[in-house]
Amino acid sequence: DSDGTTLNICRAAGPGLNAQSDCMILKYFGHGTQIVAEEASDGKTYIWLNSNASVDKSGEYGDNWSVSRVEFVPGATSDAGYAGETFFLNKDGQYDQQVSIDFGARRLLIGSRRSGVRYFWIFDLDEALALPLKKMTATVTVGSAGSEPVTREIEARDLNDCRVLGGFSVPAGSDKENDVYSYSHQGHEVAGNYVYFYEGNAVETGADSFESKAYVTVFNYSGKIVVPRTEVAAVADKAGLAPRDLRPRAMPRARV
């Protein structure tokens, strides 16, 4: 859950139980487009998510420069904009960095964007975790509508020093019926040797509710399409959702 500045990371103890009783608050980390939960071998739970975000004119934090691996501690609050282990992609000014992990295959995917193009970088997860810490800087804007630039010096891991297993880019399309990435980016996933790219309408309210369009395209690590762009259902079954009391409400705007 997010209000543009704060991410509420909640964990339900079991079916039908209130997740709000097991919640951690992260402030100024970013949009929270992609969040990964890790049940680690040390018995702890870690949350992977975007970090080091800037505030825009609407007061919402996004366009982040890194991802962080944060230990999940119920009741804790972090307001530094990053925490735990932080990873910078550090490639050609690419920002809006979003994480996906296949723990079984030990694959780490970082998605990013720049100048209307989406980029996808795949790493060996264990090699990324073993990168040495080094001092890195991130300049972000905070305060009222981005009025205060802040430069942070952070002990972090530089993914630019990590072996790249695969990488490719996807330019924005214009034909919504046919072009990959002609709708807003809504998420991505790495699974084995493949990357799943999810695009679709931002959340709509009012007359446009439940008229969502959404598509998934599957790529290999070199960017070749192995499963063509396929339409999928996303908040489109109005009749099926209504009995479950799932109704439209205002949401933060989507990132493109």
Feature names for model-found ranges:
Residues 39-44, 71-80, 101-107, 127-133:
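Secondary-structure boundary elements
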Residues 4-16, 59-76, 117-147, 209-226, ...:
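Beta-propeller blade signature
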Residues 163, 167-243:
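Loop/turn-rich, solvent-exposed surfaces of beta-rich toroidal or solenoidal domains
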Residues 28-33, 57-104:
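Asp-box/WD-like beta-propeller blade repeats and closely related beta-sheet repeat scaffolds
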Residues 1-32:
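N-terminal carbohydrate-binding/catalytic regions of secreted carbohydrate-active enzymes
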